[in-house]
Every structure is written in structure tokens, then in C-alpha cells.
Amino acid sequence: ADNSPYIVAGSGHGGYDSIIMGPTDRIIENGDVLIIDTGTVYDGYFCDFDRNFAFGKVDDDTRHAHEAVFNSTDAGFAAAIPGATTTDVWKAMWDVLEAGGALSNDVGRMGHGLGMQLTEWPSNTADDHTVLEPGVVLTLEPGMTFAPGRQMVHEENIVITENGPEWLSRRAPAEM
């Protein structure tokens, strides 16, 4: 990597209420979850990924929410084939989140284009019908509010090839 221009984090008991928050005096405790959103630049191109870390034992709701965003990422990956749209990718991810107990997706989109800028067109949303073609680089970033004030978000990077999607980021473990 040439540099790592950003690192943002958030934490809270059993989830977090924002993935981008400033520092606090709060001490991490058993049952807390820390999210780190970071990336690097290599030869002018960005990567962007989120990782979740559990401190001690988390409750079942938190574990299930993490499982839902992880599985939602897999669903988005499977849907991201040439000729599909970013709406198809969003829908595949949202269906898994909704089945997993999502109350909402407060961000609205579940990933974005990636390249010489950190956030590029297109966006994985319900109303962005961009057709995926080989060479398109996307983040898959499903996020869900699963209880009041508790979110879970996951993010990976993919590229669309003639044969389907390929992971660009090293896949996070299935368990926090």
C-alpha cells in the first residue's frame, strides 16, 4: 500500500449507533462490538472495508445480526454478475437482512463504486439501476439496524469479471 488515508471506528454494547464517530472516554467492556472502517491506496486506487470485533461474549441478537450482514454480503456477491444491476445486488442483500431481523438500513445504500476516489458511482440502492459490466469495482456494504441504537455493518470489495464477481479484499471470518 502507498498509504492508509483514513480509519474510522465506532463501538457500543452489542452493536453501535454509528460507524463514524469521534473519540470518546468510554471504556470498552465485555459484550461490546468495535467496527473499524478503513482502507488503503495503492498506485492511486482505493480499497474500503469494514471489520467488526467482539469483546468477550456478545448477546444472541448481536451474533445473529453479524451473521445476517455476513450472509448478506455473500448474497450480494452471488447477485453481482455481468448484466445484473446494482439494484439486483441491493435487493439480494436486503432480502437476507430483512429475513435476519433488520428494522432498517439507515444509510440507504449498501455499497458503492470504488476506484481513484474512495466513494464513486454507482451506489447499491433500491433505485440505482446501473448495469454491471466486467471491470466494475464495487464495495458490498450491507448494514442493518437490528434494535434501537444498535447497528451492524460489513464491507468487502469485489470486481466484476466476465465469469462473475471476484473478491478483492481478504474475506473476513464468519464469526466476530
Please give the residue ranges for each predicted region:
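Active-site neighborhoods and metal-handling regions in enzymes and metal-associated proteins
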Residues: 1-176
